[in-house]
């Protein structure tokens, strides 16, 4: 499989480089690096290509020789990892032609009349985006090396509009991959934004895909959707809502219910890891008294409310 080159996620606020980062997270060798450090490493490669600071030994004409070579890459001159500026990995390798004026032609079985031009955006239009660069053996950045956080510390900040959330899960028992994927994609994730009395505002988080990685873990990409309003049977304590920050809307014997995501996933045979250490406080079974559970009477989209009016494009109105 090739890394994504088109901006098919652009409509959802996802840049091409962010899509490439997600691709390496899913299909890479258990890469543990945040997007900021991944972008910093990409900019280093881009700047060196533009300045022509590559040594002759770096530019190998045969990409196959690069993938089969066992020699360790040399240290990059002038690079140092540190917090605030991002951790620049030690093992970066680039494969490109000696001219480096653009992408090399790729053999294809399609005829000229069958070729379809790629819908490239402004970011892909840069010549550096078209180069067949790659990072082999990205070192984990220091941003992952943090003490364990509690559930509400991890989801203390609401995701920005259009910003997806990536969850990393591990199965607790053997399961069929197709059934596991279908079950994960079918979950109704929501992100609690706040509320008052028995009214709760939440952001729908739709699973875009669920894939199994090479290290026998699962990754689920949650895409923010519409803001919804839920009417609860009982008004919960505001400090207790942190436990339901990321929840799954389920049907129970008492009706619709908001279940914390880690508890809902555990019932399906998954333990949540994400890319931040999760506090090991998930109970073995989610069983609380009816008065302590968030039972939902009705859920409607915020746009469907009579009093809701879309904001005017005119800032003076």
Swiss-Prot record:
The gene is Tex19.2. Residues 101-145 are annotated as: Important for interaction with piRNA. The keyword Hydrolase does not apply. Disruption phenotype: Males deficient for both for Tex19.1 and Tex19.2 have impaired spermatogenesis, small testes and are infertile. They show vacuolization and seminiferous epithelium degeneration as early as P16. They have defects in meiotic chromosome synapsis, persistence of DNA double-strand breaks during meiosis, lack of post-meiotic germ cell and up-regulation of MMERVK10C retrotransposon expression. Number of females double knockout for Tex19.1 and Tex19.2 surviving 2 weeks or more is reduced compared to males. Females display normal fertility. Surviving mutants do not present gross somatic abnormalities. May be required during spermatogenesis, probably by participating in the repression of retrotransposable elements and prevent their mobilization. With its paralog, Tex19.1, collaborates with the Piwi-interacting RNA (piRNA) pathway, which mediates the repression of transposable elements during meiosis by forming complexes composed of piRNAs and Piwi proteins. Interacts with Piwi proteins and directly binds piRNAs, a class of 24 to 30 nucleotide RNAs that are generated by a Dicer-independent mechanism and are primarily derived from transposons and other repeated sequence elements. One of its GO terms (cellular component) is nucleus. Keywords: Cytoplasm, Differentiation, Meiosis, RNA-binding, Spermatogenesis. It comes from the Eukaryota. Residues 64-113 are annotated as: Disordered. This is Testis-expressed protein 19.2. Interacts with UBR2. Interacts with piRNA-associated proteins DDX4, EDC4, MAEL, PIWIL1, PIWIL2, RANBP9 and TDRD6. Specifically expressed in somatic cells of male gonad lineage. It is found in: Cytoplasm. Residues 64-75 have a biased composition (Acidic residues).
């Amino acid at each position: 499989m090739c890394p994504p080159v088109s901006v098919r996620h652009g409509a959802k606020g996802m840049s091409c480089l962010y899509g490439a980062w997600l691709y390496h997270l899913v299909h890479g060798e258990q890469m543990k690096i945040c997007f900021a450090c991944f972008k910093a490493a990409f900019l280093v490669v881009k700047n060196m290509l533009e300045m022509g600071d590559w040594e002759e030994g770096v530019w190998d004409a045969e990409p196959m020789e690069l993938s089969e070579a066992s020699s360790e890459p040399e240290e990059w001159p002038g690079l140092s990892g540190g917090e605030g500026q991002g951790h620049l990995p030690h093992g970066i390798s680039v494969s490109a032609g000696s001219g480096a004026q653009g992408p090399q032609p790729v053999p294809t079985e399609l005829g000229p009349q069958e070729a379809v031009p790629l819908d490239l955006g402004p970011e892909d239009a840069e010549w550096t985006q078209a180069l067949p660069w790659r990072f082999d053996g990205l070192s984990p950045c220091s941003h992952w090396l943090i003490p364990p956080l509690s559930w509400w510390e991890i989801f203390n900040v609401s995701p920005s509009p259009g910003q997806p959330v990536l969850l990393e899960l591990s199965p607790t028992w053997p399961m069929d991959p197709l059934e596991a994927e279908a079950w994960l994609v079918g979950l109704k994730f929501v992100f609690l934004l706040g509320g008052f009395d028995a009214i709760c505002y939440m952001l729908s988080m739709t699973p875009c895909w669920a894939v199994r990685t090479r290290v026998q873990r699962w990754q689920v990409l949650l895409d923010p959707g519409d803001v919804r309003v839920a009417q609860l049977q009982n008004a919960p304590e505001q400090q207790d809502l942190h436990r339901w920050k990321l929840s799954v809307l389920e049907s129970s014997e008492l009706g619709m219910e908001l279940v914390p995501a880690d508890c809902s996933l555990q019932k399906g045979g998954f333990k949540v890891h994400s890319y931040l250490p999760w506090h090991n406080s998930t109970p073995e079974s989610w069983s609380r008294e009816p008065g302590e559970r968030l039972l939902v009477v009705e859920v409607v989209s915020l746009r469907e409310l009579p009093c809701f009016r879309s904001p005017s494009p005119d800032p003076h109105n």
